Each structure stands twice: as structure tokens, then as C-alpha cells.
Design a protein with these regions (language model features):
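Short, C-terminally biased terminal segments at protein or domain edges
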Residues: 1-48, 52-117
């Protein structure tokens, strides 16, 4: 397996863990339940789909899992922006999460483009 593909599992897993901790913070401390649940769902699904891609039955199946992960990542970016713009995330929290999110978007985009060729 390519180094970039190995790397995507690690970074999406770490991101999912951060999202779980953020969800706990948002619900327990900030008492925000709607947007945080959406982010929880999409943010953890990124890792779930990249993990499923490890056992893909074909190149097309692998590509499909990475496309789904990319769509989930795109949605997660929306929820991060919204939580930040509605003052549920500080600038520091947002910037840190956004940097990780941006890295994931880049890696997944690269994998999808390479796999489609």
C-alpha cells in the first residue's frame, strides 16, 4: 500500500478522535447539540470510510470509499465553519481543527485523483 494511503488512515483516525472530544465538549460544556451531532457524524465517518477502504474488493471500491470520505470531510468543513461563526468554537480551536481538516482534504483529493487514473 502506498505511503499516502497509509497516512490517510492515521490522520483521519486522529481527526475522528479530536471530533469525539470536541463533541463531548460542545454538548457537556457549551450545551450545543444539533450542529455538534452533525459534525460528530460526518467527522467520524471520514475515518470509517478510509478504514473500510483498506479492505476494498477492487480499485473501484477503494476509490468509492475515498470519494465518500471526501464528501464527509467536505461536510465536516461546513459544520466547523458554522460552529466557529456562531461562536461555539474559539479562533484557536477552529484554526487547529481547520488545519487538520485541510490536510485531510488535500490527502483525500490526491488519493481520489490518483485512483481514478
Amino acid at each position: 500500500m502506498d505511503t499516502i494511503e497509509n497516512n490517510v488512515y492515521e490522520i483521519t483516525s486522529c481527526f475522528a478522535i479530536r471530533i469525539v472530544h470536541l463533541y463531548k465538549y460542545l454538548t457537556e460544556v457549551r450545551h450545543e447539540y444539533i450542529m455538534s451531532k452533525q459534525l460528530f457524524r460526518s467527522g467520524t465517518n471520514i475515518g470509517a470510510n478510509t478504514f473500510e477502504g483498506k479492505n476494498a474488493q477492487s480499485r473501484a471500491d477503494f476509490c468509492n470509499k475515498m470519494i465518500i470520505a471526501l464528501k464527509e470531510a467536505t461536510e465536516s468543513g461546513f459544520w466547523l465553519d458554522l460552529l466557529h461563526k456562531t461562536d461555539y468554537l474559539t479562533e484557536e480551536q477552529y484554526t487547529s481543527l481547520y488545519d487538520d481538516w485541510n490536510k485531510i482534504m488535500g490527502v483525500l483529493t490526491k488519493i481520489v485523483k490518483a485512483t481514478k487514473q
